[in-house]
């Protein structure tokens, strides 16, 4: 009886070790990881991220922000929807690593516009974007996490 219990216990223990040892966690691709840093993971209470404008540079020259500009926020939802603190809405997508495409519908005019930003850097607390402005200069936006 004692031998039978020992064998069953060993079998159970071995099965648990095999199950735990063989379970795999599939690593995220850099593209998936970048999307999750921007907009959340879709897990409970992590379905969107709000970013607040922190600084703005043109060709490396700092442009001091007004109080209104300091309050500007962009919200990216995990499902690809976009909104901002000026009540504009739209969509976002990252199809290529480091390239953020925003399609915005402006509330005041109901017109649609698209822009592609270079994602210079992104982490859980900061988002830095570059875009070529209409005058040919480089605009650099720095955002901090707001939510």
Description of each model-found segment:
Residues 1-9:
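Bacterial N-terminal signal peptides that target proteins for export
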Residues 8, 12-16:
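Hydrophobic helical h-region of N-terminal Sec-dependent signal peptides
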Residues 18-21:
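C-terminal motif of bacterial Sec signal peptides marking the signal peptidase cleavage site
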Residues 23-91, 97-147:
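Lipid interaction determinants
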């Amino acid at each position: 009886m004692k031998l039978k219990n020992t064998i069953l216990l060993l079998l159970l223990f071995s099965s648990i070790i095999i199950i735990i040892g063989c379970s795999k966690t599939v690593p995220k691709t850099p593209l998936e990881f970048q999307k999750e840093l921007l907009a959340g993971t879709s897990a409970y209470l992590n379905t969107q991220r709000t970013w607040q404008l922190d600084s703005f540079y043109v060709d490396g020259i700092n442009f001091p922000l007004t109080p209104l500009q300091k309050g500007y926020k962009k919200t990216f939802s995990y499902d690809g929807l976009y909104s901002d603190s000026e009540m504009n809405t739209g969509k976002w997508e990252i199809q290529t690593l480091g390239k953020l495409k925003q399609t915005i519908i402006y509330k005041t005019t109901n017109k649609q516009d698209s822009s592609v930003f270079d994602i210079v850097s992104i982490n859980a607390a900061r988002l830095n974007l570059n875009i070529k402005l209409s005058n040919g200069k480089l605009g650099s936006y720095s955002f901090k996490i707001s939510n």
